């Protein structure tokens, strides 16, 4: 900075004001590219320059210590500082710098318009001859500055929280939960996720309007991101919202610097909350740009998707029954001439269909508002006949949900569409879906489980853990998959763009014994789902389905004959039969499966068969057999006419779960020498395993968890030379392990929670690099063996009661 002394203008008789002003003008002209400086400020100073020359010439008559001349001197000094500082001004500081230039301009104008006249009056002098010259100069300067002055900061309303214009129902609980998390100092980033139409934006807008939140955060900014996020535009909006001029950023790095500078400036006045609404999948790097480490700065995101990198993820659930009812009543007033009972009955049927989805309740409610009782009845009847909410007359719901499907990767789209093949409100074991996908898409189970997780993270289904989340060995029975009915409809709607016979996926619903006419034509679907009610008599039409690779049969009757046309499905790879009735259904015509050369996976749930039925089919391609909640009756051993090792030559996995009347395994299972995984879980009556189990030399995984009556493992278990994982958790009656279990040199992992009464033979010390998962009490059995066992790892886990298990039944 130049001071007055260094310029030699501090003495009486010298040009005190004009000389410095001339230096500042010459310096400012060098920066031609920056108009506020080289043009606007220079123009102002050039008009002021003759006035300063006149003032300098009258030093003897004027008192340079008076207030007006001190302020003029300060203004010229500030101009000098501002001009010399310009080369060091960063691009993101130019808006702030421009406002500083504007203030200097205004102060110079003030001197000419007011201060100079006060000075003249005080000294009773006629400056500039006072023959109109001063007045003309000042007027000209005023007009010039009106044209050239930098506009005052404009605070544009670009990032304000939207005003709520909808009724708010059912958000009190989630509002309290979110508020608690947001006020938690340890939470810096928070995501509110849910399917579209569940009220995420409404909830967050209401949260931002909460007195406690407004009291905590001095600055609350709300930005809609959507599926095409533009980081630079959002930063520009934030700057303009706070009174800065619009800046054009050449890249995101510049915008990041601009955002940081803005936040650092704002946080001096108080904490900041930045809301990013409707952020889409794949925006992780976009979100990272906002995650600047500053105290008193938090980010709140709403999304259809989860973002695991954030501190906290809150999943907004559908409305509870009472709240859903209140919302429907708000939108749809009671039709005239309706009795209370009739009105309540219609309400309940509509609510069941809407299933707590706020947007669906609103759209349906608005469509029924002011309509007659017959219209209400007609709508309910049309749903019972198969009409979908996502079609006419409710296109709004589909428009809301469709982008979620469109955003999926191609692989996930196919998997999501397959979900429409299962019944609504069904709780599906993850293993059912993965088994089907393994054969349809030829991918490994770990990849396919990842697909399920991806769909769950996008709130297109829900993945509910039942147990300890152990699926490293390809065991996915401990997860349930559920899906909201509206999302299931979304999957089905995508297939309905084609005619029935041309669809890749096809759902056939048979009420009583009525078949649609199109069943008589050739069906080209590769995934076929057939559902029958409890009145179905198993009188099948002959259907031609040559391309079916996966068949899902949903039944409700107590007796069920498999359709003979299955024998013509030569491409069939996966068969899933699920009984939704209360008792196991007697299954007949099982023999129609024997002619299927490509059938690789069979899953039977809640049906009654004899265990001898399986080897008699002689399915040489079968890889996996799953029997869940099945009834077997008496176990038969007569397989003399069947060479089991040939009849089931490729069978690698048997999964028997919750089969309550299974007290012993059929002998033929011990003859399946190809078997690699044998899971017998939650079979409380199972008391023993056959001695011949030692024949299963290729067996790698043996699961016996929750077989509470099992008292011991046969000594022949030592013959399972390839066994690497043994699960005996919750086998409460198990008293000992085989004496020579130490011979199983490939055994690397034992899971034995709640087995503290089980005796460990001395030979276990021969097992090297063993990992044991158990509870604390069982862990004591192993701790004392650590000195004798090389690399023994004991992982004690707390036993938690998982209420999700109740969802299975």
UniProtKB/Swiss-Prot annotation:
SUPFAM superfamilies: L domain-like (SSF52058), P-loop containing nucleoside triphosphate hydrolases (SSF52540). It comes from the Eukaryota. The keyword Repeat applies. PANTHER family: PLANT BROAD-SPECTRUM MILDEW RESISTANCE PROTEIN RPW8, RPW8 DOMAIN-CONTAINING PROTEIN. One of its GO terms (biological process) is defense response. This is Probable disease resistance protein At5g66900. The LRR repeats probably act as specificity determinant of pathogen recognition. Residues 50-86, 494-515 form a coiled coil. It comes from Arabidopsis thaliana. One of its GO terms (cellular component) is cytosol.
């Amino acid at each position: 900075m130049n001071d007055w002394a260094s310029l030699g203008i501090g003495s009486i008789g010298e040009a005190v004001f004009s000389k410095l002003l001339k230096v500042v003008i010459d310096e400012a002209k060098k920066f031609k590219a920056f108009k506020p400086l080289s043009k606007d400020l220079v123009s102002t100073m050039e008009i002021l320059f003759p006035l300063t020359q006149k003032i300098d010439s009258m030093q003897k008559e004027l008192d340079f210590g008076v207030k007006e001349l001190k302020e003029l001197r300060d203004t010229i000094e500030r101009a000098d500082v501002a001009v010399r500082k310009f080369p060091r001004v960063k691009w993101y500081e130019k808006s702030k710098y421009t406002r500083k230039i504007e203030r200097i301009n205004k102060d110079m104008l003030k001197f000419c318009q007011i201060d100079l006249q006060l000075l003249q009056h005080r000294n009773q002098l006629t400056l500039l001859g006072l023959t109109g010259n001063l007045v003309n100069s000042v007027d000209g300067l005023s007009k010039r500055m009106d044209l050239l002055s930098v506009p005052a900061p404009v605070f544009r309303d670009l990032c304000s929280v939207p005003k709520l214009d909808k009724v708010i129902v059912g958000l009190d609980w989630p509002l309290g939960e979110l508020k608690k998390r947001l006020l938690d100092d340890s939470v810096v980033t928070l995501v509110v996720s849910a399917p579209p139409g569940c009220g995420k934006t409404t909830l967050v807008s209401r949260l931002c309007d909460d007195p406690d939140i407004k009291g905590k955060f001095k600055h609350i900014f709300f930005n809609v991101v959507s599926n095409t996020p533009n980081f630079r535009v959002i930063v520009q909006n934030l700057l303009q919202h706070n009174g800065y001029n619009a800046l054009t950023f050449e890249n995101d790095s510049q915008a990041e610097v601009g955002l940081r500078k803005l936040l650092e400036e704002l946080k001096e006045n108080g904490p900041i909350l930045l809301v990013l609404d409707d952020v889409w999948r794949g925006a992780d790097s976009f979100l990272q740009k906002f995650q600047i480490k500053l105290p008193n700065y938090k980010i709140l995101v709403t999304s259809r998707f989860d973002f695991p990198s954030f501190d906290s993820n809150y999943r907004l659930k559908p409305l509870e029954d009472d709240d859903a009812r209140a919302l429907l009543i708000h939108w749809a007033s009671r039709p005239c001439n309706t009795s209370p009972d009739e009105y309540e009955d219609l309400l309940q049927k509509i609510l069941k269909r809407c299933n707590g989805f706020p947007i669906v309740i609103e759209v349906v409610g608005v469509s029924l508002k002011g309509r007659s009782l017959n219209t209400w009845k007609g709508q309910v009847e049309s749903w019972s006949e198969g009409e979908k909410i996502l079609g006419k007359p409710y296109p709004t719901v589909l428009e809301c949900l469709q982008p979620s499907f469109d955003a999926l990767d191609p692989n996930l789209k196919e998997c999501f569409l397959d979900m429409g093949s299962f019944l609504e409100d069904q709780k599906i074991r993850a293993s059912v879906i993965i088994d089907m996908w393994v054969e349809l898409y030829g991918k490994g189970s770990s990849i396919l489980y990842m697909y399920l997780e991806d769909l769950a993270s996008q709130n297109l289904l829900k993945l509910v853990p039942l147990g300890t989340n152990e699926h490293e060995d390809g065991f996915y029975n401990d997860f349930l998959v559920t899906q909201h009915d509206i999302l299931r409809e979304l999957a089905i709607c995508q297939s309905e763009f084609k005619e029935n016979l041309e669809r890749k996926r096809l759902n056939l619903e048979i009420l009583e014994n009525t078949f649609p006419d199109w069943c008589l034509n050739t069906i080209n679907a590769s995934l076929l789902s057939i559902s029958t009610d409890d009145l179905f008599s198993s009188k099948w039409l002959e259907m031609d389905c040559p391309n079916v690779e996966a068949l899902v049969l949903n039944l409700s009757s107590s007796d069920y004959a498999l359709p003979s046309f299955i024998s013509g499905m030569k491409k069939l790879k996966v068969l899933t039969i699920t009984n939704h009735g209360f008792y196991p259904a007697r299954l007949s015509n099982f023999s129609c499966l024997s002619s299927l050369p490509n059938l690789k996976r069979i899953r039977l749930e809640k049906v009654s068969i004899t265990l001898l039925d399986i080897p008699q089919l002689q399915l040489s391609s079968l890889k996996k057999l799953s029997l869940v909640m099945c009834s077997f009756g008496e176990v038969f051993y007569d397989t003399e006419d069947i060479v089991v090792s040939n009849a089931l030559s490729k069978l690698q996995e048997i999964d028997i779960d919750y089969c309550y009347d299974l007290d012993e395994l059929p002998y033929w299972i011990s003859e399946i020498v190809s078997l690699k995984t044998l899971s017998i879980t939650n079979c409380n009556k199972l008391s023993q395993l056959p001695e011949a189990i030692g024949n299963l030399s290729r067996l790698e995984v043996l699961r016996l968890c929750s077989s509470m009556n099992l008292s011991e493992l046969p000594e022949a278990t030592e013959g399972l030379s390839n066994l690497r994982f043994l699960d005996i958790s919750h086998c409460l009656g198990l008293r000992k392990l085989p004496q020579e279990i130490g011979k199983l040199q490939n055994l690397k992992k034992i899971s034995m929670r709640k087995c503290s009464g089980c005796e460990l033979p001395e030979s276990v010390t021969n097992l090297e690099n063993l990992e044991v998962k158990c509870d604390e009490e069982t862990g004591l059995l192993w701790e004392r063996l650590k000195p004798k066992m090389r690399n023994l790892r004991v992982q004690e886990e707390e036993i938690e009661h998982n209420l999700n298990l109740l969802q299975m039944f």
